[in-house]
């Protein structure tokens, strides 16, 4: 099914299993690597795409974090989702895909197909999935990851999503970021439990030049939090940091990383830092500088981030109030995002700027109408 060999000459297989109502990542071993014979590991994916409201509900992230992520995606930033194994990196990346406006083309590059491409395509997304050669079990007939990324650059103005950055594709990806070849959001996952560990892996292991690494704008860290008993593990977004551009050798020593959100273990919350609240984020101000009403106006930028956070929380509240979790699924979240963007444009045309209170009031009226419609259908 995978098109990749599994025999004594190739005793390792890394692939995906796609059934009508289930998806899973499969790792298989056989002799001689596994002397006792075949061994399999299955990692089942959620049938539907994760969304930011679903992560708010599960407490993986806060409404403010969701609003900030939404803002950064619309701002076409370069973003890495990092973390340890099974921390929810790919799930979070899939939820971020839902935040990309449907009028943008998306290109994904993966060696094992894990992102919810089919589900998003069914929702009307223009999305192209490229399957690349696995660094572990790939065959010569498959395309190398770096070649796939260079091909993506020739396909026009698109958002580029890389399932996992771990090999030769890193050089091609950061080269493209650095020269500005990608005008839309660029995102991917990578192993690392802190911004500096991501820097260390990218520069020292993957051999990306330090100057090229500066093309990274935002690093999100996902980790598993263990209960005092050690019996319960919870996924949490524990850190959101920006990569600043004015350092030369070591971003840790030269204050090249600035935290925007940090995890408070005592309260199990993701708290905003002074850098974010007081408008000292260079990346966010750079986004604002390209929007007339936001340029030099931190209050307007912050108001838009809070507006997005309020909308994400309202979706969760609607699901709780109606006892209908479908409100948090991708189908409805995409509709809610479309309505937010439409109302933002209409309000800006009418009053001259994107008034957060006015946008939310009209969006809330739309949400109430959607709830009534769903109740009648039920």
Locations of regions flagged by a protein language model:
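Terminal-proximal interaction/regulatory segments of ATP-powered molecular machines
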Residues: 301-378
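Glycine-rich, charged/polar anion/phosphate-binding loops
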Residues: 11-15, 24-29, 147, 205, ...
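P-loop NTP-binding catalytic core
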Residues: 1-75
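Motif I (Walker A/P-loop) of helicase-class P-loop NTPases
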Residues: 65, 93-94
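Flexible glycine-/small-residue-rich
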Residues: 17-19, 30-32, 44, 110, ...
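Conserved lysine of the Walker
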Residues: 89
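Switch/coupling sub-region of P-loop NTPases
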Residues: 70-71, 76-86, 95-225
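Conserved P-loop NTPase
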Residues: 218-310
């Amino acid at each position: 099914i995978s098109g990749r060999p599994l025999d004594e000459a190739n005793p390792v297989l890394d692939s995906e299993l796609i059934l009508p109502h289930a998806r899973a990542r499969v790792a298989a071993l056989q002799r001689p690597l596994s002397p006792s014979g075949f061994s399999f590991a299955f990692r089942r994916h959620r049938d539907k795409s994760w969304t930011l409201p679903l992560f708010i509900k599960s407490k993986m992230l806060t409404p403010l974090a969701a609003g900030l992520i939404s803002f950064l995606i619309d701002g076409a930033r370069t973003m890495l989702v990092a973390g340890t194994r099974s921390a929810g990196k790919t799930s979070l990346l899939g939820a971020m895909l839902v935040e990309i406006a449907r009028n943008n083309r998306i290109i994904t590059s993966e060696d094992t197909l894990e992102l919810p491409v089919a589900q998003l395509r069914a929702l009307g997304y223009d999305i192209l999935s490229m399957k690349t050669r696995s660094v572990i079990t790939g065959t010569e007939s498959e395309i190398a990851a770096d070649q796939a990324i260079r091909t993506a650059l020739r396909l026009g103005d698109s958002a580029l999503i890389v399932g996992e950055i771990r090999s030769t594709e890193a050089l091609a990806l950061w080269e493209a970021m650095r020269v500005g070849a990608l005008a839309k959001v660029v995102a991917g996952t990578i192993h690392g439990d802190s911004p500096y560990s991501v820097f260390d892996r990218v520069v020292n292991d993957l051999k990306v030049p330090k100057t090229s690494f500066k093309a990274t704008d935002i690093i999100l860290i996902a980790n598993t939090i263990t209960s005092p008993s050690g019996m319960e593990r919870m996924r949490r977004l524990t850190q959101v940091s920006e990569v600043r551009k004015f350092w030369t050798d070591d971003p840790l020593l030269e204050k090249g990383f600035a935290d925007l959100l940090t995890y408070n273990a005592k309260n199990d919350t993701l708290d905003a830092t002074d850098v974010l609240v007081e408008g000292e984020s260079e990346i966010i101000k750079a986004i604002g500088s390209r929007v007339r009403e936001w340029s030099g106006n931190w209050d307007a930028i912050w108001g838009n981030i809070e507006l997005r956070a309020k909308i994400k929380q309202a979706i969760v509240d609607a699901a709780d109030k109606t006892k209908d979790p479908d409100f948090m699924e991708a189908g409805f979240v995409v509709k809610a995002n479309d309505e937010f963007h439409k109302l933002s444009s209409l309000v800006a045309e009418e009053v001259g700027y994107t008034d957060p209170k006015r946008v939310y009031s009209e969006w809330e009226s739309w949400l109430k109408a959607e709830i009534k419609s769903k109740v009648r259908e039920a």
